[in-house]
Swiss-Prot record:
Keywords: Glycoprotein, Membrane, Repeat, Transmembrane, Transmembrane helix
Biological processes, Gene Ontology terms: amino acid transmembrane transport
Protein name per its UniProtKB record: Uncharacterized protein C2E12.03c
Domain of life where this protein originates: Eukaryota
Positions annotated with a glycan in the UniProt record: N15, N228
Molecular function GO terms recorded: basic amino acid transmembrane transporter activity
GO cellular component: cell division site; cell tip; Golgi apparatus; membrane
Short name of any one Pfam family annotated for the protein: PQ-loop
Species of origin: Schizosaccharomyces pombe (strain 972 / ATCC 24843)
Domain PQ-loop: 15-81, 149-204
Transmembrane residue ranges: 19-39, 48-68, 108-128, 138-158, 170-190, 206-226
Lipid bilayer topology: Multi-pass membrane protein
Length: 283
């Protein structure tokens, strides 16, 4: 099976310096992107609005992404990127278990640390095995890792999108986190044409950037446009209060004995009441 990349070794392209700069920018963004979200969760002692499966998918997706970037000998910054990103994703996942699911501290730590050790061992095994296969011209595992990374990274947003449409609002997500994350995806994508063009890596970073921009669009629609339409203005509130007073008086007149069904003056009413009592009085 043909490889999804060119055969030129990394760093030999005339614009390799530009590729390195963009890759470093992308790595820096991806390394710090979750920090605003982690701080937000810590201060609120809550992960409400942040889907646990969304974060877990990123933890899992970092495994094939790291393996793919390593065996494809991409830019050194892109090799380090998934490892640092996964460490922050593990931290956020711990917060989801501890704050969101209310797990005991020891249980949450045990699960996360065990998962981290398993992930590290699995990555090392896959990298060695796939590189051995490449020497024997078996390249389909490389393509599989690239496709798996692309699917897992991007499908992780599906539960988040479902939560957004159900709530008709974007809540619990740090916009700074999304801005940094989408910038990291964009810079990583831009690093590819300047050195080694990798189709699967381009699809991964490019599609992730588009999906994250979609969250911003939904936030503008639900949190700004629709919210403003459903919120009455000051003029509407003033008119409603005055109109409500008039309605209250009208309803009071209707249901009052001395209201619309009582049109006689008080003097006539008193005389009428006296005559009535006299008429029914038994001698």
């Amino acid at each position: 099976m043909p490889s999804s990349t060119t055969t030129a070794p990394p760093g030999t392209h005339p614009n390799a310096t530009a590729s390195t700069v963009f890759a470093i920018l992308g790595t820096v963004c991806w390394c710090v992107q979750l920090i605003p979200q982690i701080i937000k969760n810590y201060r609120a002692k809550s992960t409400e609005g942040l889907d646990t499966l969304f974060i877990l998918s990123w933890v899992v997706a970092s495994i094939p992404l790291s393996v793919y970037n390593q065996v494809q000998e991409l830019n050194i910054a892109l090799k380090v990127q998934p490892e640092l990103f996964q460490a922050l994703a593990f931290t956020t996942f711990f917060q989801c278990l501890y704050y969101g699911s209310k797990w005991p501290l020891r249980k949450a730590l045990f699960v996360v640390i065990s998962f981290m050790l398993f992930s590290g061992g699995l990555q090392a095994m896959l990298i060695l095995t796939i590189k051995l296969g490449i020497r024997r011209h078996v390249e389909w595992p490389v393509v599989f890792m690239g496709v798996l990374a692309t699917v897992l990274v991007n499908i992780g947003f599906l539960p988040q999108y479902i939560s957004i449409f159900r709530a008709r609002a974007v809540t619990g997500i740090s916009y700074l986190f999304l801005a940094i994350d989408s910038s990291g995806s964009l810079f990583s994508f831009l690093s590819l044409p300047f050195d080694r063009w990798d189709v699967l890596a381009a699809v991964d970073y490019g599609l992730l950037f588009i999906i994250e921009m979609g969250v911003f669009v939904l936030a503008f629609i639900f949190n700004v446009l629709l919210k403003n339409k459903s919120t009455p203005t000051d003029e509407d509130v003033t008119f409603t209060e005055e109109d409500g007073d008039e309605k209250d008086e009208e309803y009071s007149d209707i249901f009052s004995i001395k209201g619309k069904f009582n049109t006689r003056p008080n003097a006539w009413q008193n005389a009428y009441d006296s005559d009535t009592k006299s008429a029914i009085q038994i001698p």
